[in-house]
Amino acid sequence: VIGEDSTESYSIESELLKNGINITRLNGPRMFNLFSYFSMYSQFRNEKFDVIHSHQPRSDFMVYRINKYLSKKSKWIVSVHGKYDTYLEKGSLSNNLRKYFMKRLSKHWQSAFSIIAISEEVKSWIENLNHELNVVVIPYWIDIKNSGTIVKKDRVTLGFLGRLNVNKGIEDLIDALNSDELKSLDFKLMIAGSGTDEYLEKLRNMIEKDNIENVNFLGYIENREEFFNNIDIFVFPSFSEGLGLVLLEAMSFSKICITRNILPMTNYIDEDSGYLFDDVNGLSHSIASSIQDLENNIE
């Protein structure tokens, strides 16, 4: 059962259908709506699922509430994909509400059959929320057959891939491109991923205001292999991640990687295997250094 209607969920749906797995989509309003609860309750009651596996806080909350009222209780498995209350928001009120909600949700997780974290970092975060929870770590995986080689192109191409929101640090990346250190270098930036129209407009306005050229927004992409084959350097300026799977993907394609100097990214990248930065100036310098290293080492 796939709930929220989005480009990403349709991609997941197509993969499941290829493997002969039937899909029921529960379209409708989000969590705090009686229609959503009624639709999900009816589906759970009629199908009598042995296992229910939820993947997002909204889904966790709904499954917890509905499963309490089912005559046949399903085994509920929770997968936690990030440190949800650490993501950046516009104001302190929203931050406080998020923290309150996560603390409350962590108590509901106590009724789950199993709780899965995608990294040790996320496991520690969960246990700090509620020390009574027993958490198992099952990391994401990548297909190492994607491993590629670095080849010289006419122009150095930087790339970012991920959901476009404040937490991903795209604004820092745009600010870095406007630095004097990078103005004399010849490169382009490809930004792949979806975001709200409002936030995309904000990013485009930043680029236009600073007269930055050669930045392309690709939107959501299905073919990640093609994206990685078309870039030379992967920039991942996110402020908070549960694992940073896309960083591992970039590494599997032998791309030079630049990422913020925070956990869990520093579990995979150090000064010998990539570039770490702390602020916008550090990001500018890392981009300049990586471009120079790329040009010096590829014939």
Task: Enumerate the predicted regions with their spans.
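Short hydrophobic beta-strand element within catalytic cores of glycosyltransferases
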Residues: 2, 256-259
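Nucleotide-activated donor-binding/catalytic signature segment of Leloir-type glycosyltransferases, i.e.
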Residues: 202-219
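Carbohydrate-associated surface elements
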Residues: 121, 141
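Membrane-proximal helix-turn-helix segments that form the acceptor-binding/catalytic region
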Residues: 41, 96-114
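Conserved acidic donor-binding segment of nucleotide-sugar-dependent glycosyltransferases
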Residues: 271-282, 290-298
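Short His-centered aromatic/hydrophobic patch
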Residues: 54-60, 80
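A conserved mid-protein helix/loop that constitutes part of the nucleotide-sugar donor-binding site
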Residues: 156, 160-179, 198-202
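Aromatic "clamp/platform" in nucleotide-sugar-dependent glycosyltransferases that forms part
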Residues: 220, 239
